Amino acid sequence: MLSPKVNPNGECLAVAKVLESIYKSNTIKVQLDTLDLTKEEITKVRFFTAIQDFNIDVHARSNPFEFYKRHPDCFKPKKVKDNDLLVDELLNFLGAQSQRDKRKPWMLNSAKLLVEKYDSSAYKINEIHNGDVIEIVKALTAEERYGFSNKKAHMFLRDMADLGVWKYKRNIEKLDVMSDKNTMRVALRTGILQFRIPLLASFLDVFCYQYSMVDRLNREVWRRGWEEWGKIMSIRSWKI
């Protein structure tokens, strides 16, 4: 019914050229104030907040790294795994009021995952999986009860790289630009992704077959944009 078209007239190249003009003299990074926390601390904060990044903006209310400084126990796996009160404290801070029946088990089970498989350290996940992006994503998304969808896992791994916490050894090119209201909106408005009828990103933000298809195509078209941008950057580097 939607008759999707991916990059029908070379729009990805046009978008890549715009991105290059904006960022060739600027650093691309996640804009988060980590308050000089250690890499271990940054990882545990982002691990537990990434799980809850579902229909809420975890940075909208306050800086979660600041919350960590005041309430470090909310991010200690051994304490979290058996303590509903600590989970409630973090969820209240994040403003995660909806779907508590899912959010609390995610926290408890993901804490148990860290205790049982990663020596209670989210930071060690990268080391234990030898810096392999695919293996880390597989481990985090192996069971739904951990709370990591594919989207959340890729977002978490991207942030760990951008914040200088983890360095990957294999399959870094497999990291996706994940679908959200921003990437979908830009894809639709620039025409890198086109449909037979006009669509609104907000309309698509529901769990249905059409959304799954658009999500997949959105990731695909942004990967093409990345590839075009990479070619432009390579040419620029060669000229220098």
Predicted ranges, named:
Residues 1-240:
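HhH-family (HhH-GPD) DNA N-glycosylase catalytic core used in base-excision repair
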